[in-house]
């Protein structure tokens, strides 16, 4: 359905590049599967309607089709059968069917809250740059794409290379990517941890972490180590490469290196041209892609 809608003339600019149905099918699959691969840039092929459809496809992929169907069922006051609950439990990576409905609504609340907050931060840069309407829309598009780790943007054909040294865009998008890649189970654990710490105020910080799941511990510790190690390695490998970050100051070099480390594991955005990166750096990026997210 998504590919058919994107292939219709009403979804295209009047002067958009000539495309076939297979091009739109490829883009649709890439959006729903949140891979970030595209045979035609979103900004050149699709108008406002096409880009809204693209956002919906990415959001569907990020949340998962099973959870969307279940959410719709619960919203319509209907009940899920046992087989449907088993499917939803598996889709949400839950060990139990207890409180599936409440857990699902938490997932949606977390998703839309993080996307909205990050979009507001991005708007502080995009509204002065693109104007009110386009600034808000472009911010929402980028926020949805980044949180869902989809890797698409509607800003041009160079990904985020024009914003390589822009701290607002880099940090906001990196935060969204990390938030989406951690997984909802980790986020729910983090929220419960913060509530427990605020409410009980344990004298020893370690006491607040005791109910934290082993999965959350593993994901957070490994993510921190990979980000720190990956950033330093990418910086050391590229710091003298004038085609990538060699002409930037140290803080800008670290910012670019950090962003590549974040996006390589799951998202697919880019603030440098990887064809200009050193072979050893691209090898590092390949290893990060193999490792992936939480």
Which residue ranges define each predicted feature?
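Membrane-proximal intracellular helices of multi-pass ion channels
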Residues: 1-294
